[in-house]
């Protein structure tokens, strides 16, 4: 394992001091500065700085990221979706009418993407097609990432893949090892069943692994597989995912190497994770199970928005003290004094997060969820633009939606040095996770569209979503 640059400097300092001791060049004539106490003092100072450099938290940099953009042949318009549903001969007329209403109010446009096997009549989902979808998305995102960064796959020491519903054997992380012929000591992780918030969980895992592995690159792949996830029954609680979820995936390059700071786009400042799974209502609000006829699907509770709001409140309680300015903290203390100490009836305290965040990347889970977050946090239509436009252009791409949203912000040339970005993810369990990044440099126009999935369409956005 390589020695970090800061550690190397401290070790070099100690070696120089030892050499000086041996040469007796630190001799002073005054009794107070006699050689022995001077040597001991300098040695203690060196030990202190060495201990500080080895125990302090090393920065984690986001070198770059890339989102997969499928080919036009995989685009699925509303009309194509309805034709597919009818051609499958699985759904009743009432079910098709219900999905029609959901899709028309979903906020999705006609340029989202579907697996190729779902565009045939009838659809032909299979394990082979599921693997094909994952290979296209994962390798497409990774190839773009390696091209953008100039980093070879074998230089990466840590790979983390998160895909909630598709868990083949060998794993998706092993598929990457095989494709890129990675080194035998590469550390790989495969996260499943973590829902749409798994991308944030992967960032947290990568951050902790980078603390234990200096001078290392970590790559995160966030995706979901649609081929085997389509619900083929008529239970209304399980039909909404059919209408909202689409093909997508992202690859993210993280580094703890000090020399990467200059070229990296962002530095990680905070991760706050909230898990409300101890509550049955939260645990079962988004659950994969069988319907009354034994058909597997993901059932969404009518309480989903309420559960998400409660989880968000808990998450913000932990995040607020880390990011809010002093003025907002004082207002919060005043609210607590009035409501708790004096039992006064006061309006709920809602922090102004626009004071500490420039860009908002809220998980594009659905129109209702985005509306609730916008209203609950007092955000503007402009603040929610990246999320709503991502939902319109790409649909709900699960854990990778946060990166399509950040790609939108970059494509609009809005990222300036020092800006803070808030990525907010929701997922089954129920989980609510926040990631805060600080932009290390301004993203110029000639770089913002390179390998960006918005490159061919950002000029059309924003659009009005009815």
Curated annotation (Swiss-Prot):
Q: Which GO terms of type biological process are on file?
A: fatty acid biosynthetic process
**What are the residue boundaries of the FAE domain, all occurrences included?**
52-341
Q: Which reaction does it catalyse?
A: a very-long-chain acyl-CoA + malonyl-CoA + H(+) = a very-long-chain 3-oxoacyl-CoA + CO2 + CoA
Q: Which InterPro entries match?
A: 3-ktacl-CoA_syn, ACP_syn_III_C, FAE1_typ3_polyketide_synth, Thiolase-like
Recorded GO CC terms:
membrane
Kindly identify the residues recorded as the active site: 196, 275, 359, 363, 392, 396
Q: Which residues cross the membrane?
A: 32-52
The GO terms this record gives for MF are: fatty acid elongase activity
Task: List the SUPFAM superfamilies hit by this protein, alphabetically.
Answer: Thiolase-like (SSF53901)
Q: What is this protein called?
A: 3-ketoacyl-CoA synthase 13
In which organism is this protein found?
Arabidopsis thaliana (Mouse-ear cress)
UniProt lists the gene as HIC
């Amino acid at each position: 394992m390589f020695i970090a640059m800061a550690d190397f400097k401290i070790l070099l300092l100690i070696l120089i001091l030892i050499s000086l001791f041996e040469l007796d060049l630190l001799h002073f004539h005054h009794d107070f500065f006699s050689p022995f106490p001077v040597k001991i003092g300098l040695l203690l100072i060196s030990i202190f700085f060495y201990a500080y450099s080895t125990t302090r938290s090393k920065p984690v940099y986001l070198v770059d990221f890339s989102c997969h953009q499928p080919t036009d042949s995989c685009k699925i318009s509303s009309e194509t979706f309805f034709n597919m549903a009818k051609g499958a001969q699985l759904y009743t007329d009432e079910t098709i009418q219900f999905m029609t209403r959901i899709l028309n109010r979903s906020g999705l446009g006609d340029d989202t993407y579907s697996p190729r096997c779902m565009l045939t009549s009838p659809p032909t989902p299979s394990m082979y097609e599921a693997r094909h979808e994952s290979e296209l998305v994962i390798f497409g995102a990774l190839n773009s990432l390696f091209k953008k960064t100039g980093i070879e796959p074998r230089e990466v020491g840590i790979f983390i893949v998160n895909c909630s519903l598709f868990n083949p054997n060998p794993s998706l992380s092993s598929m990457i090892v095989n494709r890129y012929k990675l080194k035998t000591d590469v550390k790989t992780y495969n996260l499943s069943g973590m829902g749409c918030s798994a991308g944030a969980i992967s960032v947290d895992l990568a951050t902790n692994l980078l603390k234990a592995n200096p001078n290392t690159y970590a790559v995160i792949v966030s995706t979901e597989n649609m081929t085997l996830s389509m619900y083929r029954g008529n239970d209304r609680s399980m039909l909404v995912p059919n209408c909202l979820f689409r093909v997508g995936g992202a690859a993210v390059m993280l580094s703890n190497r000090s020399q990467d700071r200059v070229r990296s786009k962002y530095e990680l400042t905070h991760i706050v994770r909230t898990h409300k799974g101890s509550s049955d209502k939260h645990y079962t609000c988004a659950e994969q199970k069988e319907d009354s006829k034994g058909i597997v699907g993901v059932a969404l509770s009518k309480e989903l928005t309420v559960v998400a709001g409660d989880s968000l409140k808990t998450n913000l309680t932990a995040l607020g003290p880390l990011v809010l300015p002093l003025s907002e903290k004082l207002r919060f203390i005043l609210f607590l004094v009035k409501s708790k100490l004096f039992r006064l009836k006061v309006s709920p305290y809602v922090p102004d997060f626009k004071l500490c965040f420039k860009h908002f990347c809220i998980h594009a889970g659905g129109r209702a969820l985005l509306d609730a977050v916008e209203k609950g946090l007092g955000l503007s239509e402009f603040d929610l633009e990246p999320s709503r436009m991502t939902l319109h252009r790409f649909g709900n791409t699960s854990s990778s939606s946060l990166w399509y949203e950040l790609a939108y912000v970059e494509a609009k040339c809005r990222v300036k040095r020092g800006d803070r970005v808030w990525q907010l993810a929701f997922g089954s369990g129920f989980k609510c996770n926040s990631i805060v990044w600080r932009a290390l440099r301004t993203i110029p126009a000639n770089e913002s569209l390179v390998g960006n999935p918005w490159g061919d369409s950002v000029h059309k956005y924003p659009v009005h979503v009815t």
